[in-house]
UniProtKB/Swiss-Prot annotation:
Positions with a binding annotation for S-adenosyl-L-methionine: 41-43, 60, 87, 111, 118
Record-stated family: Belongs to the methyltransferase superfamily. RsmH family.
Protein's name in the database: Ribosomal RNA small subunit methyltransferase H
Enzyme class (EC, first level): transferase
Protein's organism: Nocardia farcinica (strain IFM 10152)
Gene label: rsmH
Gene Ontology annotations of biological process type: rRNA base methylation
Molecular function GO terms recorded: rRNA (cytosine-N4-)-methyltransferase activity
Catalytic activity: cytidine(1402) in 16S rRNA + S-adenosyl-L-methionine = N(4)-methylcytidine(1402) in 16S rRNA + S-adenosyl-L-homocysteine + H(+)
Enzyme Commission code(s) on record: 2.1.1.199
Location in the cell: Cytoplasm
HAMAP family: 16SrRNA_methyltr_H
Keyword entries, A-Z: Cytoplasm, Methyltransferase, rRNA processing, S-adenosyl-L-methionine, Transferase
Amino acid sequence: MNREQHGARHVPVLLERADELLGPALTEPGAVYVDATLGLGGHAEHFLTRYPGLRLVGLDRDTEALRLAGERLAPFAERITLVHTRYDGIADALGQAGLPPTGSVSAILMDLGVSSMQLDEAERGFAYSVDAPLDMRMDPTSGITAADVLNTYSHGDLARVLKNYGEERFAGKIASEVIRRRAHKPFETSGELVELLYATIPAAARRTGGHPAKRTFQALRVEVNGELDSLRAALPAALDALRVGGRIVVMSYQSLEDRVVKQELAARTSSRTPVDLPVELPGMGPEFRLLTRGAEKAGEREIAENPRAAPVRMRAAERIEAAS
């Protein structure tokens, strides 16, 4: 699929709301916008067009996404720096753009999870609706695949991954069946795994909670790509990069991600004065203030136009004090 085809199918999620939240930090001359999950560049193109003085630092671990985004953003070539890295590489990416890792950024967007392009390309193995190689790597140039996890992990490690990252009730039962089947034939395709899940998860449980493969595929994807560990490292680095008045928007698509984001923002919006002191110490107040009340969701109209917006949870914050 070429850039035009991808662009026609990719609709940026919560674009107008992201602009409302980030826009006040992007109007000043020389503002720096970091898109930590560049994807096909839909959000970035919007901001570069709307804010003519804006400078973009775009990150993505997917080399094909970077290539396509580079083509899409070619009209803004003098204002962009694109870096092949995970979002926890934000400090190094800023360095490549000639910027310090702290206090140099006006706005940051993190649109987490698997991209539309990755879901649409069957050979990437992210979708359980088509039979494809069990890959699931966001960076197809490195790392283990989902097949490697299924074919080499111990029963205990498999059950841990399925339970912790997929919140799968039948993690132990599924792990046992994986071990049994791989002794006869290693797993190669998503269809083999989907068939196992239909056979292993009780019929009553399959009737609720969506597709029976949803939780297992999520767990494998998170494990293969180190998504939660990367997010835990990325959020502090992203928040540190923001100048006073700088803003961040994070969009999560599953509860595990949103929980990490919620906890980090809660910590950064709390007073830094020791709890046993009766008054707030100068310079020890909260570094950030929340811009959203809880996690915001897409409206019915947007979900109807773009079904992939249905699970999104958006949180945002603004730096109000310099880092101590």
